[in-house]
């Protein structure tokens, strides 16, 4: 059930909305829109006042509805007696200790000071830091809580179960809540583990464990969401989409697999890996706390002085929060109800990059859970209806499939309004064509060069061994352990290669010795993601992609011989050889793309714009007088902006040169459209007759081919245009997905030259920038430490605050309010840094110097300047220039000589009359 308030509704295409209010979700694809259109913080309609009010208790009542408290978040009905509940203040339960609790942490008590839990005027980060101290008993107030003694596993591993708020417990359907076969605390307690070890040491032998393994459950599907600093809307978009996809899998009725070995939901684990406390958006933590997978105040900075590396939370929940900040909870046993989902939340204490997050996923959690399939998602990627099911089915039906990916397409907004941005439209077209032409081709060969980390899947046993070993060489946290094989011992080429580490994993998987794993593309599985909307972000993103893919592509070609050690059959090896030749050829074309684009532009303009005997002394489009002049200007502008790209790339960050890059995109776009018009003119002339396209169609096929492929090159241009325009249209209609040809193709044609002239130039000019290391500082000082107590011969224990359930619920009420507050994007400051301003001045100075000198050289030596009114020939202009230059140098030398002579004479005279 979705709870609605007064916010605006914003449904979009291919989303999850059925537009219903306070109704169960239907099981059709239309149910995949975020189910709510209004904010939860407005007044609620009776009889269900709050998001956690239990509708089961209301059904069948004929009397007047039960009176609720005035709060829209009343948890009164959630304080139901529970056999597992105990009062920490009652006798024989625990003893009081010196731990104090900030009185501001208590809620609903008149006269209490404002709490950081409800403080809206304080930044979310600062309020979060205060909550850690307050909730953990580190405040300066007088409130005292009872404590309990927690034994460390094997004397060193801190793993504690914390009661979840009553509202979360009671949101679980009774059939799951009352079933104690799996685990008595699975739905009543959240498990927290402070991992003070490297991911490779997170093993059962060292005392670490995970709930699914503790409950002896087989994990078929491990769904991982990697996160850096995305806001709560982006995170909820991904997490809610995953929850709905799991519902699709659980609702399968005829699947032989899911009817074996217990309920389907027990075979699926969702793992969120956050890359550092400091960059993490603290509002996102409120969303996770609302569904039960996180609590404030339980994390420990260190255990007996040993620093915590990762904070791991585990809980099984039936709650979800939509991107519109609407809370979804089960209401009945219908197909629209979300099933229980086993969740793990790994919050790394320090930012150590995405590849390290994957090491936690595969080497730490994967080895304990031993899943069959791992699905990788980036926070912000929204899986489409049944997308995860289609990915899993691909592995289920192909025992040799080692990895797969779905179709990623750009998020276009409501009514496709983002297509008005040419950059977004161009990227949309690029993604679509890649999914129509490139991915199917590579899938046919059996080796997809890259499975995007934002939306891909791997068979866990396929990547175990050498593939993961090679993959994790790029983890800088292993640099000391690996030595020369690690990131610190790599040359600049290998470091760039690990900017596209997913390509390395794909190659190593296919080339795995003694195995015959192949990769595939699953067209039915779709994911939606945001794309950069501004030039600086776009350029920075593509720098990493282009440099990483180029280096990884060369690596795979140079190490192709390792394929002979694999277990592929002769047919597969034949196709892999074809793909190798195709990749060599593509790399060759990519290397010379800069010159190719300039020559193509120049040749097409000369063909249609230069009057000659071969074209009847005509010129398109401005006539035989103006067209050559304009074409010459266009060429000079093209070369000038191309030179500018090198100046910008070698000295500036894209964010520090926004206007320059914007002007470059516009200039190259206008030139590209001008060339496209010229090329279309060639095609028209080819089929209407007329020089230079007057093909011989009267003397047989031989004469026609001879004229078609003649020295003018017009026939080749027609073939290239047909291969570009025609192939894109035909393939798009074959895949029944042609809309991008009408909405995005024109924008792509305008931006296409910028892909070469701007993106490639910037990428290669910044080959040295591999962006390794942590981003920013890592602040964990807000977290309390855990210290053991106990004398000699006694087991090491830690005293942990044992809060009463009423206080847990009161604090949770404020957490829900924060989580469901409508998201307001922060304003981005456009101010340049001091370093950027210095670099911008340097760029303007160098640009002025180079272009003024270049303009002088062109004016003196160019033969075509007579078109601009210069009456002299280039030879005569050169002669006069040298005369002026020689006279100028002579005058300067004469002045210097006069000055030197005067100084010498003056010095001699003064020497004679100087006083001794």
UniProtKB/Swiss-Prot annotation:
This is Chitin synthase B. Optimum pH is 7.5. Keywords: Cell membrane, Cell wall biogenesis/degradation, Glycosyltransferase, Membrane, Transferase, Transmembrane, Transmembrane helix, Zymogen. Interacts with kibesin kinA. The N-terminal disordered region controls its phosphorylation state and is required for its proper localization to the hyphal tip, but not essential for septum formation. The gene is chsB. CDD domains: Chitin_synth_C. It comes from the Eukaryota. GO terms for cellular component: cell periphery; cell septum; hyphal tip; membrane; plasma membrane; porous cell septum. It is a multi-pass membrane protein. Activity is stimulated by Mg(2+) and is inhibited by polyoxin D. One of its GO terms (molecular function) is chitin synthase activity. It is found in: Cell membrane; Cell tip; Cell septum.
